Amino acid sequence: MTIRQALWLTLCVLLALACMPLRADAASEKQSQPDGRALFQANCAACHGENGAGDRKPSDIGFAFKMPNFTDCSFANREADVDWSSSIHRGGRARAFPRTMPAFDHALSDEEIDAVIAYLRGKCEKSAWPRGEFNLPLAMFTEKAFPEDEVLNITSFNTSGQRAMTSTSIFEKRLGATGQLEVNLPFSSIVGPSGHGETGIGDMGVAYKQNLLADVDSGTIFSLLGEVVLPTGSAAKGLGDGTFSFETHALFAQIMGDYFLQGDVFGALPAGKGLPNEAHGNFSFGRTFAEDGGWGRSWSPQIEFLTTQAFAPGEKLQMDIVPQLQVSLSRRQHILASFGERIPLNDRGPDRQPQFMFYIIWDWYDAGLLQGW
């Protein structure tokens, strides 16, 4: 099976799954909840402390490493419920944490584990830090609304037509509870305007993202992002536009049971003459599956739809489709990879050829590059 056939098979599976009924809301299936606080005190407080602050002395718990502080919202709210649930069900080994964290899947029921998590969540219920449920799988082109601490590299190259390759390195750093700084720098190898091969850096972007809404109950997140693109690439060699450019993004995501929809609607406004303003709309729909009963390696097929409209005489609305698949590489799930193919749906030409794409992400807040495996 070729890569293109595999990607189209992924798309067909994803669309078929979209026709299945969504998972019922767990809250509607339960008449009453177990007492999460009492369960925590009986099963967890001996190591994690009575308040979940991880303040027990090493001499009291018998090991030296620092316990997590569940009252620290800058830490606790970054993680999704499924991450905590996996460590409780399968023990520390499930996410490459110390094996001193035992597995409770035979000691507590699923409902009791959910109640313990709900009790811990109550300590940061009114926190401004967006919940980890909104840290959805990254699509190739659709910027996420969730603020991140990560480094990634996205590489694309033409699969037909003239030779072209671009590799973009991106650094993202959270600022406070709801802000994020982003710096990206592309490196390209192309056939330039002269007809000869050209290699070098492209135009660097510096962006700031501000989250405005993150309602975990409704599954909705919304953020704004502004970016300045600097003319660091050579326009004469075809590696850059030769002018400053400004971008304004509206970012959103909606969680729908097991599925998610992400959107990135933005305008690109070049400062130099001769370059048209552009409007873009990128949208991604997908679902995440996990091995080992939902606690292991994650697989996230997505289908992305891209639109671009340049505001110049004779310019057509350009549309692309990008079937893709993300997979977690490390047990901590802080190292992820994705691959896919960008397929122009119309207006093909030398600058619009099918492209194979892949990326590697390192969520450096969760663990070091060589940790968590």
Predicted stretch roles:
Residues 9-18:
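Bacterial N-terminal signal peptides
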Residues 111, 127-373:
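Transmembrane beta-barrel domains of Gram-negative outer membranes and organellar outer membranes
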Residues 2-10:
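Bacterial N-terminal signal peptides that target proteins for export
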Residues 24-28:
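Boundary at the C-terminal end of the N-terminal hydrophobic targeting segment
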Residues 60-121:
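Extracytoplasmic electron-transfer domains, predominantly the class I c-type cytochrome c fold
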Residues 31, 37-66, 90-98, 123-127:
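Periplasmic/extracellular electron-transfer cofactor-ligation site
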